A protein has these predicted regions:
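Extended recognition/assembly regions associated with phosphoester-bond processing machinery
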Residues: 1-451
Length: 451
């Protein structure tokens, strides 16, 4: 998508001084996540695993000489008892409590389990490494089953034991990808607003909260200083789960006309919130709509009417008849990647992180974010436990360039951390809370990310 610079209506403050909203250069990088020429012909998921292993193995092979140059690199089939070597492959975690689809089919659909565990970890879980030649069970304490998940590609230093397992002595991960050098910090600051989990149409949704947020962004609340800050907001990203449709309407039954209209009500309400005209004594201009005031990206989430499997494709623009008339409105993919003034943003609506919390453990959600960067993969558990499209010749979730901002939406609370890589990479990690529950949106300074 070509770069975009837009003119926006000026804002006025109490002193009648006009404030012009700042502008930024936008570049969409979602092409990798778009399913355009892909055709489903009944292919299996093995091909996406082969593509992932091929790409990651090439990368890890290039890192081995600086890690353990004195050791030979072997395949699983070439392992010899007691001989130290390095093997590269895809991890598979054998989990005692992992739900089995065959068990689900064997139960009656109407019977729900009494307990739905939020985490399927068990002390008897163990890891297996697999390549094209075979698989081997892993032992030792260097590779904790509680940290790793199925789908991660690693290099392991160790040796085969008499029991036929591979005793791991050291682990090499891909590490943070290279990062494009950021432009020098500018004195002219700009801000990006992230909000997720609006859940319009749910019982927990409060339109008044969102209205207050819109008023802040458009410069209709606060004193001169706050309105001056609003003029520095150059972009808004809605990170998934914008609406929530009653499950009673999604049971696969034919709907009467009344229920059919109820399906679209949440989107009608959201579109109105994004396009309504604000009345203000500060200005005579009637164009103060958030969709017209600044560029707006909207990503699909797990509760939105989009395809279930990742990467989720953009929400159909016909759902937003009012917002879609503005060239500042963009319906984007999930995951979503873009650049603002050469600052790279990468993020998801939260499904990848939610799945990691079910099959591994960490002290906080930011640790999960950091791991995906070090593994260079946005969704390592896909397609094992997280639905994704069966790509045949590529894995779109591989991270080949380190973002400056890495965000994930629909989390329980706001968290942030600055991650520093071994080669000088600096990444601002952000967990964006559900707005319907917390009333919190996240404002990110584009040129002062380390702050």
């Amino acid at each position: 998508m070509p770069s975009l610079q837009s003119k926006f209506p000026a804002m006025e403050v109490d002193s009648q001084e006009q404030l012009q909203r700042k502008q930024s250069t936008y570049l969409s990088l979602d092409e990798n996540f778009e399913i355009q020429k892909e055709v489903y012909r009944g292919q299996q998921y093995s091909q996406i695993y082969f593509a992932r292993l091929h790409m990651m193995r090439t990368l890890l092979y290039s890192l081995v000489p600086n890690w353990k140059s004195h050791l030979p690199v072997c395949t699983v089939l070439e392992l010899e008892e007691g001989k130290e070597c390095i093997i590269v492959g895809t991890l598979y975690k054998h989990m005692k409590l992992k739900p089995c689809i065959l068990d689900e089919y064997s139960k009656e659909r109407s019977v729900a389990p009494l307990i739905k565990p939020h985490n399927f970890m068990h002390q008897d879980d163990y890891l297996v490494l697999e390549d094209e030649s075979g698989r081997v069970k892993l032992g030792g304490t260097k590779l904790s089953p509680s940290v790793y998940v199925t789908g991660v590609v690693v290099a392991l230093h160790g040796k085969e034991t008499s029991a036929g397992a591979f005793f791991v002595e050291d682990v090499l991960e891909a590490g943070l990808p290279p990062q494009i050098e950021r432009p020098l910090e500018s004195r002219e600051d700009k801000y990006v607003v992230f909000v997720s989990g609006l859940s319009i149409g749910s019982s927990s949704s409060n339109p008044l909260q969102f209205q207050l947020l819109v008023d802040h962004i458009t410069g209709h609340l606060g004193d001169e200083e706050e309105q001056g800050l609003a003029a520095e907001i150059v972009h808004l990203v809605i990170v998934g789960n914008s609406v929530e449709i009653s499950r009673g309407l999604l049971n696969g039954q034919n709907l009467v006309s009344k229920d059919q209209s109820r399906l679209s009500e949440p989107f009608k309400e959201l579109d109105i919130l994004l396009t309504q005209v604000f009345s203000s004594h500060h200005c005579d201009d009637q164009h103060f709509k958030i969709a017209a005031s600044l560029p707006l990206d909207i990503m699909p989430g797990s509760s939105d009417p989009a395809n279930f499997a990742l990467p989720q494709q953009p929400l159909n623009r016909c759902l937003f008849p009012g917002s879609a008339t503005y060239n500042t409105f963009r319906s984007c993919t999930n995951p979503h990647c873009f650049e603002l003034d050469s600052i790279r943003f990468l993020g998801t609506s939260g499904q990848n992180l939610d799945d990691l919390t079910k099959y591994s453990e960490a002290k906080d959600k930011l640790d999960f974010l950091e791991r995906t960067l070090r593994w260079r993969h946005l969704a390592p558990t896909a397609p094992n436990t997280l639905g994704c499209y069966p790509f045949t010749d590529r894995d779109p979730f591989l991270i080949d360039s380190c973002p400056d901002v890495y965000f994930v939406g629909n989390q329980e609370k706001y968290e942030t951390r600055l991650l520093k890589g071994l080669e000088g990479q600096l990444v601002r990690l952000i967990c964006i809370p559900r707005f319907c529950e917390t009333g919190v949106a996240v404002v990110v300074s584009v040129f002062h990310l380390p702050g």
